[in-house]
Curated annotation (Swiss-Prot):
Family: Belongs to the RNase HII family.
Cellular localisation: Cytoplasm
The species this protein was found in: Streptococcus suis (strain 05ZYH33)
GO BP terms: DNA replication, removal of RNA primer; mismatch repair
SUPFAM superfamilies the UniProt entry points to: Ribonuclease H-like
Broadest EC class assigned to this enzyme: hydrolase
Lineage: Bacteria, Bacillati, Bacillota, Bacilli, Lactobacillales
Binding positions (a divalent metal cation): D76, E77, D168
Protein name as catalogued: Ribonuclease HII
Cellular-component GO terms for this entry: cytoplasm; ribonuclease H2 complex
EC number(s) recorded for this UniProt protein: 3.1.26.4
């Protein structure tokens, strides 16, 4: 009779809930074996749910592939709402059929997993481009236009020209065919990939700014108007990376602070 350790090793090789191994092991009444079976089944059930989620997020991509499109770029941005720092956009072309576990809208991914998923996207992507527009440009042209410019910059930095664009709720001035998707980062894997690249890139920039401009909590709040950030503004005033057309900074500038 196989030891519990051997049974556990065997179960680790099972990758389907339909495997005949389950019926074979069901006859083994040892508590350790039954616990190992329960644990492995739960793991596979969780993987099946994740596979189904990823498959659903490839709906737009698969439709385009079926129509002969080869290279699809997902485009998304991070940083439209903060009071400080740039808006960052990313464009990502994933290989056909690529599934990256736990890739989702970056806002739904635990921060502890950001870096690992970012690295996997960077390793597996056909091409990645990043566009960055600073606070000065945001103040000059407005955040909506700056976001579009960041997206176009990211698109222009791709080493492979895409045949079609999937964009999160935006339309770009480009001859490349495009599809604008509401909540695209939660409904398209390509856009989700762009979302995590933009998020990690911007978070790293804000962490660097935190060292340069201490007292605002940029490493933690990424430039959003948290209590710590607002207190820093009141005590220290504005920095060169603050958006002067955003309140309350706009009023502070008008008041001479």
């Amino acid at each position: 009779m196989a030891t519990i350790k051997e049974v556990t090793a065997l179960l680790a090789q099972v990758d389907s809930l339909d495997s005949p191994v389950w019926d074979q092991l069901a006859q083994d009444e040892r508590a350790g074996v039954q616990a190992a079976i329960k644990k492995r089944r739960k793991e596979l059930e969780k993987e099946a749910v994740e596979d189904a989620r990823l498959e659903a997020m490839l709906f737009y991509e698969k439709s385009l592939y079926e129509n002969g499109v080869e290279f699809i770029a997902g485009i998304d941005e991070v940083g439209r709402g903060p009071l400080a720092g740039p808006v960052v956009a990313a464009a990502v072309i994933l290989p056909k059929g690529c599934k990256i576990r736990y890739l989702n809208d970056s806002k739904k991914i635990p921060k502890s997993k950001h870096e690992a998923i970012y690295q996997e996207v960077m390793e597996r992507a056909v091409a990645v481009g990043v566009g960055i527009k600073d606070a000065a440009l945001i103040d000059e042209v407005n955040i909506y236009e700056a976001t579009k410019l960041a997206m176009l910059e990211a698109l222009g930095k791709l080493s492979q020209k895409p045949d079609h664009l999937l964009i999160d709720a935006m339309k770009l001035d480009t001859p490349i065919p495009q599809t604008s998707i509401i909540k695209g980062d939660a409904n398209s894997l390509s856009i989700a990939a762009a979302s995590i690249v933009a998020k990690v890139t911007r978070d790293k920039m804000m962490a660097d700014y935190d060292k340069e401009f201490s007292g605002y909590g940029f490493a933690k709040n990424a430039g959003y108007g948290t209590t710590e950030h607002l207190e820093g503004l009141n005590k220290l005033g504005i920095t060169p990376i603050h958006r002067k057309t955003f309140e309350p900074i706009k009023s502070m500038v008008a008041g001479g602070n």
